[in-house]
């Protein structure tokens, strides 16, 4: 199913890599043409098209190894390559996980009446289709373009749904950080070109500076360097498309890093990436375990899992590609499992609990890949501390997941039995897909990984028990201490400086408008004439 050991091939055979995205774009067109229909009809169409796309992607697993060139144009002075989608094992696994999340969101939409607008319903397949293209990006040119398009699309959506002016600085901060990462990717291409190498296909970029810039761009988008934890609170973007916007970007980054560093991180980058992984695992894990609202705490969940994945890759360089790929799968599937699981019946608690078991390293799951790497780290030279930090990160993530599973039960928002059944299928699908993908991954099962999983699981249970028994005042104190690590005050200060500069420029520019502009133009002309006269012989 996963074709984990199939070698990469970038031969331009057929356009298989574009098929899932094309299906999603067609879905958006169909939904737009049916925009005046009732919500039930729109839900049925979107769910049917999502299921069809999901099955098509599943069938494409036999074609792993092909690639698709999307253009004749190439910027030879910098990238010397065309737009390229690589349908390798990493890309297929990520695409399958992303489409599983998309299908789950489509199935559960009917259980959230009124929460999905027509614009959101149409944008969901468009955003997912562009995300698939970014996951399959085979070179730096494709990464730069797809990242920039996704950033712009996200910015437009967030600005359209926010009703709180205080949230705008956070949205612009997110756009600025992501834009800086795109510039860093362009810098990686420039460094590669200046060194005399023109090949920007991932896996074949050997320039140390270029590799370092690619890794740095990934860390920026993961929120590790510099730290930028979250988007502002957007009540209309908690679930649905909000889930996609928070889970897709880090998975895209991990797909790129897995493709570039499949054979291991360069020696020069290992200390830097280990430090970033430790920051993500510890800070992200602590903030996630202390999060009062799991939905608003998703950025810390992403930061913790991404940091833990980087630590695991540093422990076991021989499996870097598989580790980073499965880290992205965990972010998508486990993140979707708790993001969509509103507890309406006791049976619904099963899926968040199962997701917690997966994320702490259960065998035969993507989490087992990380647990196995950490188990090997305890026996390696100089890697025991990385394994220990990884165990702390997994335990903290599990603690936060258990807290979400025991959240209070709420009433059904809708009474139709079919909607309830489909909703149960939708929230359980990511967990079942994670189990199926883990069963096909050889690195997901090892004796050491099982032992590590038991230890991390016990630590997560103990952490949850301690959090439950801890007085509320102490929890608030812990959140207050942890929030001091939040760099948002610095970003707010930078925003105020930016606004002050704009206000100054506006004040200076106002006299140049209207009649004042004509007067100033006369003054400029007189000064020029005086200058010419003073230089005349």
Question: Can you say where each PLM-predicted feature lies in the sequence?
Answer:
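Hydrophobic membrane-spanning alpha-helices of multi-pass integral membrane proteins
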Residues: 250-251, 352-364, 392-398, 418-436, ...
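Alpha-helical multi-pass transmembrane bundles of energy-transducing inner-membrane proteins
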Residues: 34-41, 121-209, 220-223, 288-352
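Aromatic-capped, Gly/Pro-kinked transmembrane alpha-helices
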Residues: 441-447, 468-537
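Short helix-boundary/re-entrant hairpin motifs in multi-pass inner-membrane proteins
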Residues: 76, 213-272, 292, 299, ...
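Transmembrane helix-loop-helix hairpins at membrane boundaries of multipass inner-membrane proteins
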Residues: 2-18, 27-115, 121-122, 473-476, ...
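Predominantly late transmembrane helices and immediately cytosolic-facing juxtamembrane segments
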Residues: 224, 325-351, 358, 381-428, ...
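Central hydrophobic cores of alpha-helical transmembrane segments in multi-pass inner-membrane proteins
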Residues: 16-34, 45-60, 76-80, 95-111, ...
